[in-house]
């Protein structure tokens, strides 16, 4: 699958992978900052952003997409940053290709199985009457009945775009994501160990990490460093300056 990506900067390659229902757009500001030091590739994973849609949606497909992307763009031994679902893709890639990654940064996700509790968000997105609404405000009003947090609503509504007729449409492949939602919570699908330098940046207020996960992390990523920031799940959005500082210090 030929993935859409944004590239900027020169130097050592740095690949950034967004989370579920996100896109390369979410990483624009940080990507620009990192481009002062690296050749940054911000990728839209399948069924997200401007990348193609497919009924197949699991970590095997996402990992193979990343392998194909690197081959096609002649990227060797990059640093990789992955948030949430993107972090799971990055971890699977690193374990499957242990000599194919220089340094790995995983943001607010660990290599365990999760019960994905986004059913309400999916219901809300599917309930927006795209054929009737004419403004994003109308879309947000419809979504507010399902999601009380305005920041989360704005995040989800970044997936709305207008087609050639001027009507709203979803960039994300909602049917495929909805069908395979629990698969995004799967544990590691590849077995092995990645011995390269690894940094886990987790949110203190997030449900995705607990201190009891440290042993599991160290079993698969023995050279992992684990750092907590005072955030929820969207670490890089809530504390962008602290996050960027940690990333740049680690990648030096």
Positions of predicted regions on the chain:
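Conserved alpha/beta-hydrolase catalytic His-Asp/Glu region
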Residues: 116, 131-185
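Gly/Ala-rich beta-loop-alpha elbow adjacent to hydrolase catalytic centers
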Residues: 82, 86, 90
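Flexible "cap/lid" loop of the alpha/beta hydrolase fold
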Residues: 92-95, 102-134
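Catalytic histidine-centered segment of alpha/beta-hydrolase-like enzymes
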Residues: 231-244
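Active-site loop/oxyanion-hole signature of alpha/beta-hydrolase fold enzymes
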Residues: 28, 32, 41-82, 245
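Conserved HGGG/HGGXW glycine-rich cap/lid loop of the alpha/beta-hydrolase fold
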Residues: 4-52
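Alpha/beta-hydrolase fold catalytic core
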Residues: 1-15, 35-38, 75-76, 182, ...
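Conserved serine/cysteine hydrolase catalytic core
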Residues: 165-219
């Amino acid at each position: 699958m030929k993935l859409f990506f944004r590239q900027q900067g020169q130097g050592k390659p740095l690949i950034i992978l967004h989370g579920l229902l996100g896109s390369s757009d979410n990483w624009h500001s940080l990507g620009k900052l990192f481009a002062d030091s690296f050749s940054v590739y911000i990728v839209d994973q399948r069924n997200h952003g401007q990348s193609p849609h497919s009924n197949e949606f699991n970590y095997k497909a996402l990992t193979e997409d990343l392998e194909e992307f690197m081959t096609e763009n002649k990227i060797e031994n990059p640093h990789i940053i992955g948030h949430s679902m993107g972090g799971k893709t990055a971890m699977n890639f690193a374990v499957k290709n242990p000599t194919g990654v220089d340094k790995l940064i995983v943001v607010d996700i660990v290599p365990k199985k999760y019960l994905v509790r986004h059913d309400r968000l999916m219901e809300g997105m599917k309930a927006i009457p795209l054929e009737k609404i004419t403004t994003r405000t109308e879309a947000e009003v419809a979504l507010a009945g399902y999601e009380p947090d305005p920041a989360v609503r704005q995040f989800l509504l970044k997936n709305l775009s207008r087609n050639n007729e001027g009507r709203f449409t979803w960039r994300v492949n909602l049917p495929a994501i909805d069908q395979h939602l629990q698969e995004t919570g799967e544990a590691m699908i590849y077995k092995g160990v990645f011995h390269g330098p690894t940094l886990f940046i987790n949110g203190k207020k997030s449900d995705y990490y607990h201190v009891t996960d440290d042993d599991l992390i160290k079993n698969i990523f023995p050279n992992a460093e684990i750092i907590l920031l005072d955030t929820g799940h969207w670490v890089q959005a809530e504390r962008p300056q602290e996050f960027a500082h940690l990333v740049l210090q680690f990648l030096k």
